[in-house]
Structures are given as structure tokens and as C-alpha cells.
């Protein structure tokens, strides 16, 4: 077998399709009981980010695969179960299921002296086996290692309520009649706070730092359609920033009017949060903004403004660590937390190892994943070639320097990409 693909979510299936189209033999290892990745609803005993109210934040016509669109019956922003069903349908249509080994967890990936890769996996019965491959494509994402404040605020160990991470949150109905504090202002935080506000007795949203909250549509266009529009990509970075800032003022006013902290950075200097719902829930009094948590005191949560609220649960929506425990330390995440990949795909100096889907665009990721997958397949069969290692490292250094200049040293910033310019790299080097 030539290639091992790790993960059978949106990215892994795109890789499988590209390899199959080029006649490259492969196996795809997936630790879950079905394909679909983060869009699957985790079963009993499973952990996963697929809470029941999870929907796409990007429009279906740009999130579906190019030659296998999502069903016309789907809404513009399908729910997670619809996306999971769509991904399984794609796997069936593309003939990928025979290549996927389910309930198979990758334990270790190491390169041998002869350049091949030894992959150790564990099946559902706990039996480990080792196989050799010429190439390995990691498409498992980075939503498995929950990031919590370390240390938690003082008093957390004696808090009488429940403290959990969004990875373990499933349904607002589980908190019916309870008082809940949600921590964060990212995608999962605003989704979960809105969900809880329909079930919990009281829902508080604790926000340490302001982020730009962006409606899913501006002037009747989804934000991912805007990100791929020719007129958008013809504008300079400064022009795009001014356009969005003015559009946000028109669409929702200032965040301080909702009791949220104003961002301390301009648009495109940090991650944005897409939501049509959270600001409305705040306006209706269903979600109450609060500052950061300072400490816990028995059944009370004390905030940095000195106020305190009784709470039965605290849900930390504080993201994930970028970890790949089956890979050697420092690959692809350096000691400073930056992801060091040529074109956000190839770790320089590790021939035969690739990463697909380890990017964070403003807009839909699918076009990027398909471009990465096609490029990787061409690299594997020799239709494309990599530059020298020195040149790849120089590209990585230049890219990361630009990221620091634009975003600062924010966690996760090193996987941010602009859709248009990023896709252009592949179009120029791989003309169809």
C-alpha cells in the first residue's frame, strides 16, 4: 500500500478522492465508527465537538465538494447531521468506503531509515498493528485536545457546580432549569450560549477579550461568497478592512452597545466569529454578557468587575491545543506554537509526509482542501515536485513573519489563510 490517510472527515475524504482519481493505492484510518469527522454526532462514550445545534457557518454551495454539491433540499446553512449524511453520501458516490478502516486509531507515525513510514494503529479490540507506507497524509484536524485555562481560576477545585469543555457539551436540554456560564466568544461559545438560553434558567456569557462578531450574510451575500468574489480579491487588504468595518457598523452597530467588549484590534487581525443569533439573544435578555472569570467561591462565579453569580455549570469554549500525539515532537507544531508547513501542507525535511485541512480561512474550507488534496496526489505520483528544502523553509519563514505582523503571536494564527491568494498558489503551479 502506497499511502496512509489519517482521518475520514471532509479533508480525508477529499484526499481519498484525489488519490483514487489518480490510481494511487491507499488506506484511510478513522478512529470513529463512521466517516464524517467533526460533523458526526458523537455516540455514547465518544468525545467530539458535534453538539446538537451545530450548523455550518459557511454556505452549502461553497462547502460541498466541487463535483458533488449538497442536496438542493438542504437549507443554506445545514445542520451537522445533514453535513454528516452528505459526507457519507460523497464517500459512497466516490467509492471510498472500501478504502476506509473504521474504529482504527493511529497511535504512532515514524519515518524509517529507508524513507518509508511505519504507522502503528489500534483497532476497536485494542489490538495494535504496524504497517509500512511510502507516504502519509494527515487529515485528522485539530479538534481533539481541549484547551482549558491552566491553571483554572482560584477556587475551581471547590466549585460546587460542573466545569466542562465544549468538547463534552451536547444539548442545552441537559441543562434545563440550571444556571450556566459560557466562557468565550468564538464559534462554539456563541452557538452554545444561544442554545442554552432556550433551556437554562439563566445564561451568562463570560468574555475576556473582544472579537469581531460578523453576521453570516452581509448585504444579502454569505461571507464565504464575498471572500471568493472577484471584486473582493481585486481590493487591497486595507480596502477590504475598511469595507468590512463599515458593513459591520451598518449591520449590527457597536459591540459595546450589547454589553460586549470592543475588539482591541482591527478586522482581520484576529479570528472572527460568525453568528446571526448571539447578538439577538443578548438584545432579548436571554444571554447576559459578563467579563472574565476571576475566581470561584462555592456555588458562585466571581467576575473581574467584582460581580458574582450563582452557577450550576461553567462551559469553557476555549478552543483546542494544536497537537498530533502520534507524530514526533515538533512536527508540525514548533515550540512557539507556530505550524511550520510549506504551503500549509508540507513539513520541510520530512519527505513523504503531508497535512491537508490544517488551515483556517475566512469562508468555506472545502475549495482549499480540494486544491491541497489534488496537489498532494500529484506530488505523490510525480506529476508535481517540491522545491529544495532550503527554499521551502524560506517560504515558511516569510509566511510566518507575515502572520506575526498581521495577527501578532495569537494562538492558532499560523494556520490563517486568505482564500483567494491561497488558491491562486495552486492554480498557478497546477494548471488544469
Specify the residue positions occupied by each region the protein language model found.
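Aromatic- and acidic-residue-enriched carbohydrate-binding clefts of CAZyme catalytic domains
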Residues: 61-62
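Long alpha-helical segments found as membrane-embedded helices
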Residues: 396-404
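Flavin (primarily FAD) cofactor-binding/catalytic cores of flavoenzymes
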Residues: 1-53, 69-217, 221, 229-392, ...
Amino acid at each position: 500500500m502506497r499511502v496512509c490517510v489519517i482521518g475520514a472527515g471532509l479533508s480525508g475524504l477529499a484526499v481519498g478522492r484525489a488519490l483514487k482519481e489518480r490510481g494511487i493505492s491507499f488506506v484511510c484510518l478513522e478512529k470513529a465508527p463512521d466517516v464524517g469527522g467533526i460533523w458526526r454526532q458523537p455516540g455514547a462514550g465518544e468525545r467530539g465537538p458535534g453538539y446538537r445545534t451545530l450548523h455550518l457557518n459557511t454556505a452549502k454551495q461553497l462547502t460541498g465538494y466541487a463535483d458533488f454539491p449538497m442536496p438542493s433540499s438542504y437549507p443554506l446553512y445545514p445542520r451537522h447531521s445533514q453535513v454528516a449524511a452528505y459526507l457519507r453520501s460523497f464517500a459512497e458516490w466516490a467509492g471510498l468506503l472500501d478504502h476506509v478502516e473504521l474504529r482504527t486509531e493511529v497511535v504512532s507515525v515514524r519515518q524509517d531509515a529507508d524513507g518509508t513510514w511505519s504507522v502503528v494503529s489500534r483497532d476497536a479490540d485494542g489490538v495494535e498493528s504496524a504497517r509500512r507506507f511510502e507516504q502519509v497524509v494527515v487529515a485528522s484536524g485539530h479538534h481533539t485536545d481541549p484547551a482549558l485555562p491552566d491553571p483554572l481560576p482560584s477556587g475551581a477545585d471547590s466549585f460546587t457546580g460542573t466545569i466542562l469543555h465544549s468538547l463534552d457539551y451536547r444539548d442545552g436540554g441537559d441543562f434545563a432549569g440550571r444556571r450556566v456560564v459560557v466562557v468565550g466568544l468564538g464559534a462554539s461559545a456563541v452557538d452554545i450560549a444561544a442554545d442554552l438560553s432556550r433551556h437554562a434558567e439563566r445564561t451568562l456569557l463570560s468574555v475576556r477579550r473582544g472579537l469581531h462578531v460578523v453576521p453570516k450574510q452581509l448585504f444579502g451575500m454569505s461571507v464565504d461568497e464575498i471572500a471568493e468574489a472577484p471584486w473582493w480579491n481585486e481590493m487591497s487588504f486595507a480596502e477590504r478592512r475598511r469595507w468590512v468595518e463599515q458593513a459591520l457598523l451598518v449591520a449590527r452597530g457597536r459591540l459595546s452597545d450589547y454589553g460586549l467588549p470592543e475588539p482591541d484590534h482591527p478586522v482581520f487581525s484576529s479570528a472572527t466569529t460568525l453568528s446571526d443569533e448571539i447578538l439577538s439573544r443578548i438584545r432579548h435578555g436571554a444571554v447576559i454578557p459578563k467579563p472574565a472569570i476571576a475566581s470561584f467561591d462555592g456555588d458562585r462565579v466571581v467576575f473581574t468587575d467584582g460581580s458574582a453569580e450563582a452557577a450550576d455549570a461553567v462551559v469553557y469554549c476555549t478552543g483546542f491545543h494544536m497537537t498530533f500525539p502520534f507524530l514526533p515532537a515538533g512536527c508540525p507544531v514548533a515550540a512557539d506554537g507556530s505550524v511550520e508547513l510549506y504551503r500549509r501542507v508540507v513539513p520541510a525535511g520530512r519527505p513523504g509526509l503531508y497535512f491537508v485541512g490544517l488551515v483556517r480561512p475566512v469562508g468555506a474550507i472545502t475549495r482549499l482542501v480540494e486544491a491541497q488534496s489534488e496537489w498532494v496526489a500529484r506530488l505523490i505520483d510525480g506529476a508535481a515536485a517540491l522545491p529544495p528544502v532550503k527554499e521551502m523553509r524560506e517560504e515558511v519563514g516569510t509566511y510566518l513573519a507575515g502572520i506575526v505582523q498581521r495577527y501578532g503571536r495569537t494562538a492558532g494564527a499560523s494556520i490563517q489563510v486568505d482564500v483567494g491568494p491561497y488558491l491562486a498558489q495552486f492554480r498557478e503551479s497546477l494548471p488544469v
